[in-house]
């Protein structure tokens, strides 16, 4: 009887795990990143077109306020947390501020456990080189001293100008 009870519990646990995180079980790192990117972009698109309207303080820095439709993303973590809840990993919305891209909505954590808002996209990294050309970057990146498998895609306004960056990533094993 004990053996069958154990097997039932194991089966229930396995079924629950598969239902809650199928992408992480069956997909590899590249597929995970691509699926997460599609999710963050589709969630943003349901809010509306990306625009920059006004400025706002993010972690003490005054930066442009990026919106999807009427929803301001600066200091708003709903979208990135929903993505993390659904597919794991990390997600960020960056806004272009001068020559930098600043994290305004993120679930990437600093060493002290706080959200890494106000930090910038590595100015010497491969991702920013691609984004500066209006291109996407998929590959490894160092994020706040830790290796991640990542995806970065430009956020464009209605005129096609790059106004920000979508980011998703998974800590490299």
Predicted regions and their residues:
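Extracytoplasmic/periplasmic sensor domains and loops in membrane signaling proteins
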Residues: 74-88, 105-145
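C-terminal segment of classical bacterial N-terminal signal peptides
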Residues: 16-24
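Bacterial N-terminal signal peptides
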Residues: 9-17
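Extracellular/periplasmic ligand-binding regions of membrane signal-transduction receptors
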Residues: 29-73, 108-115
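Bacterial N-terminal signal peptides that target proteins for export
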Residues: 1-8
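Hydrophobic beta-strand positions
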Residues: 93-95, 108, 155
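Short N-terminal helix-loop-first-beta-strand/juxtamembrane motif that initiates sensory/input modules
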Residues: 35-53, 80-101, 138-140
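Conserved beta-strands of PAS-like sensory domains
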Residues: 67-71, 147-173
């Amino acid at each position: 009887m004990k053996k069958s009870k154990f097997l039932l519990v194991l089966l229930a646990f396995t079924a629950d795990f598969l239902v809650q995180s199928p992408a992480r079980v069956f997909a590899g790192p590249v597929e995970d990143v691509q699926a997460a990117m599609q999710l963050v972009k589709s969630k943003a698109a349901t809010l509306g077109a990306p625009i920059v309207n006004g400025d706002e303080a993010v972690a003490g820095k005054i930066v442009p306020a990026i919106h999807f439709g009427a929803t301001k993303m600066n200091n708003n973590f709903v979208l990135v947390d929903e993505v993390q809840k659904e597919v794991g990993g990390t997600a960020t919305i960056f806004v272009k501020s001068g020559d930098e891209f600043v994290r305004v909505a993120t679930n990437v954590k600093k060493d002290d456990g706080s959200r890494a808002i106000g930090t910038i996209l590595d100015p010497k990294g491969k991702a920013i080189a691609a984004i500066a050309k209006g291109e996407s970057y998929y590959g490894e990146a160092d994020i706040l001293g830790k290796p991640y498998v990542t995806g970065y895609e430009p956020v464009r306004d209605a005129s096609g100008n790059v106004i920000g960056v979508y980011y998703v990533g998974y800590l490299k094993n």
